[in-house]
Design a protein with these regions (language model features):
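Polybasic, glycine- and aromatic-enriched phosphate-binding surface used to engage nucleic acids
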Residues: 1-132
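Non-catalytic DNA-recognition/assembly elements of restriction-modification systems
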Residues: 119-151
């Protein structure tokens, strides 16, 4: 995960689909990936990257490593929804909230799933704003989220 996006390939051995590791295989669709492990020294606990199906559209499945959680919808997520979720999980508000929930450097998927999020229509609206801004910075995410939180 680098600069708000999933960076692939990284040039490491065995980073491609490993068919014998079914637990690491996902259908190729839009996801928000969240790093599972962060160092104590890192400023942020929630570090996420956008992955869109169109990046590798020729594949039916993709493989991830167990060092990343992924956020997905039951019916998949639109690109706007992925960007909207990025606004939420890349914001300072949610990073601080997560640190209050969990003092560990490991980002737990159970705790991510328990975090409150707005309705999907709001998430998609935030995503549209982020796409239009063409700026994935924490500050931009904070500005968009604050508009919805504070009115």
């Amino acid at each position: 995960i680098k600069d708000g996006r999933v960076s692939f390939p990284r040039g490491k051995e065995k980073e491609y689909n490993v068919k014998d590791r079914k637990g690491l295989m996902q259908e190729d669709r839009n996801y928000l990936f969240v790093k599972r492990f962060t160092a104590k020294e890192e400023r942020r606990r929630l570090q996420c990257g956008i992955y869109l199906k169109r990046y590798l559209s020729s594949f039916t499945y993709i493989s991830s490593q167990n060092k990343a959680n992924f956020i997905d919808g039951l019916q998949g997520l639109s690109e706007c929804a992925v960007y909207g979720l990025y606004v939420i999980f890349n914001s300072t508000l949610y990073d601080v909230y997560y640190r209050i929930l969990n003092g560990s450097t490991q980002v737990n998927s159970t705790e991510i799933n328990a975090m409150p999020v707005p309705d999907m229509s709001v998430i998609e609206a935030m995503g549209k704003q982020l796409i239009a801004a063409k700026n994935l910075s924490v500050e931009q995410c904070n500005n968009i989220l604050n508009h919805y939180v504070n009115g």
